[in-house]
Regions:
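AAA+ P-loop NTPase nucleotide-binding core of proteostasis motors
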Residues: 1-215
């Protein structure tokens, strides 16, 4: 069943069920649950994914685990892509399929196929900052219109997808955050400042939220 049809009592206890399994990231969990609740309440545009979230923080603080637990508690699948495997220009073809006449045309696109097969899921794109810049054009399309057309003209529908992208962009700077500004810059603010340097404004502007994870 789509998350929009989840009964309210299950959603009401969602925060606590996630916190039971994730320690020390209460603020991050709150933001994620809030995004799901907004989708449930019909407060988002029908032609967009349920949520488009960027998780930032150092390695090993639970970014991927929150996505896993969220999917499990919502009773939907987790579809994961490691974006460090999509660093080359031709990586776009892997996600949406190669053009006619090219090797791999018959294979279709890995992302479009996955969403057509599992249209109701948490889509996790790990280490998004490593993806080739052309892949961001695909993501803008997904965040804007909740659909993607593959190489054969078939559409994948992202309206019941919670899109979560993880990044450790800025984590290394955050540890130096107390330098300067008389120590007033929080590590979270330092990470968010680095996010602005790492990602294009049109990408950041389309996110439902940027969620900071602390170590």
């Amino acid at each position: 069943a789509a998350i929009k049809d989840e009964d309210n009592s299950a959603l009401a206890s969602l925060r606590q069920r996630i916190l039971d399994k994730i320690y020390g990231q209460d603020t991050a969990v709150d933001k994620v649950v809030e995004a799901v609740m907004m989708a449930k309440a019909g407060l988002i545009d029908d032609d967009k994914p349920m949520a488009s979230l960027l998780f930032v923080g150092p390695t090993g603080v639970g970014k991927t685990e929150v996505a896993r637990v969220l999917a499990r508690e919502l009773g939907i699948e987790l579809v994961r892509f490691d974006m460090s495997e999509y660093t080359e220009k031709h990586a776009v073809a892997k996600l949406i399929g190669s053009p006619a006449g090219y090797v791999g045309y018959e294979d279709g696109g890995q992302l479009t196929d996955a969403i057509r097969k599992t249209p109701n899921c948490v889509l996790l794109l790990d280490e998004i900052e490593k993806a080739h810049s052309d892949i961001y054009n695909i993501l803008l399309q997904v965040m804007d219109y909740a659909r993607l057309t593959d190489n054969k003209g078939q559409k994948a529908d992202f309206r019941n997808v919670i899109l979560i992208m993880t990044s450790d962009a800025g984590a290394q700077y955050a540890s130096q955050a107390n330098i300067g500004f008389a120590g007033n810059v929080s590590r979270g603010q330092a990470m968010l400042a680095q996010v602005k340097k790492t990602f294009r404004p049109e990408f950041i502007n389309r996110l439902s939220d940027t969620v900071v994870f602390h170590d």
